[in-house]
Amino acid sequence: MRRKLAAGNWKMNGLRAALAEAEAITAAAAADGPEVLLCPPATLLAPMAAQAEGTALQIGGQYCHPAPSGAHTGHVSAPMLRDAGASYVIVGHSERRQDDGERDADVRAQTLAAWQAGLTAIVCVGETEAERDAANTLAIIGGQLAGSIPDTATGANLVVAYEPVWAIGTGRVPSVDQIGEVHDFIRARLEQRFGEGVGRSVRLLYGGSVKPGIAAEIFAVSNVDGALVGGASLKAADFTGIIAALG
């Protein structure tokens, strides 16, 4: 059975004082419950990992450069994330695809780098509002899955997050039928490409304005194994409510 996962993406938010929120979230992370992951900005990764040592809380990065080191000013590599205490890294988030021009090939290279460093990659896919309105959602996501995920995927090194771009930070949420259609499609594509064993073991997260009040309804949808949470993960009261709905 796939273990549920609540992943919090803090994005470019949080100074050292925010470690108090992470400590409060730690109390909701239990070895026999849903897995709980926080992905803080790079400046907080090491202190948050140190604070979480000996607990069930997992720590992750928000991006990694494909190269392990080198003359890449301002970037962070997968080995650096691992060295700082990360066990996961988000790759291909829609904000990086849009703001930084990342393509599927870039996401694929980052995923390989993450695996080589011993990190589990959370590969993000999703359509824009224009693509959904044009009825191209599944075609877009199918292309992203094919282009972004390397051939050596396993249930241990890969998590896929579906994030409808038009729902991120807007308060808009797709219907449960829309979420279910996409998650079932992703599951089928993974099984088709990697076989039933791997395809059924990869966890699928929903990400797009997830809030405590609607979390239970989303988590009841077929093939939704958890959530990639943005703003609601910044406050322990909100994120622990989502974790409780998952557990």
From Swiss-Prot:
Among the Pfam families in the record, one is: TIM
The answer to whether keyword ATP-binding applies is no
Q: Which residues form the active site?
A: H93 (electrophile), E163 (proton acceptor)
Signal sequence span per UniProt?
none
Q: Which GO terms describe its cellular component?
A: cytosol
Q: What class of enzyme is it?
A: isomerase
Localization terms from the record: Cytoplasm
Q: Please indicate which superkingdom the organism of origin belongs to.
A: Bacteria
This enzyme catalyses: D-glyceraldehyde 3-phosphate = dihydroxyacetone phosphate
Pathway(s) it belongs to: Carbohydrate biosynthesis; gluconeogenesis; Carbohydrate degradation; glycolysis; D-glyceraldehyde 3-phosphate from glycerone phosphate: step 1/1
Alphabetically, which GO biological process terms does the record hold? gluconeogenesis; glyceraldehyde-3-phosphate biosynthetic process; glycerol catabolic process; glycolytic process
Entry EC number(s): 5.3.1.1
Q: What is its main location?
A: cytoplasm
Locate the residues binding substrate: N9, W10, K11, G169, S209, G230, G231
Q: PROSITE patterns, from UniProt?
A: TIM_1, TIM_2
Listed PANTHER family: TRIOSEPHOSPHATE ISOMERASE
Q: Quaternary structure per UniProt?
A: Homodimer.
Describe its function: Involved in the gluconeogenesis. Catalyzes stereospecifically the conversion of dihydroxyacetone phosphate (DHAP) to D-glyceraldehyde-3-phosphate (G3P).
Q: Which family does it belong to?
A: Belongs to the triosephosphate isomerase family.
Task: Write down what this protein is called.
Answer: Triosephosphate isomerase
The record lists the organism as Dinoroseobacter shibae (strain DSM 16493 / NCIMB 14021 / DFL 12)
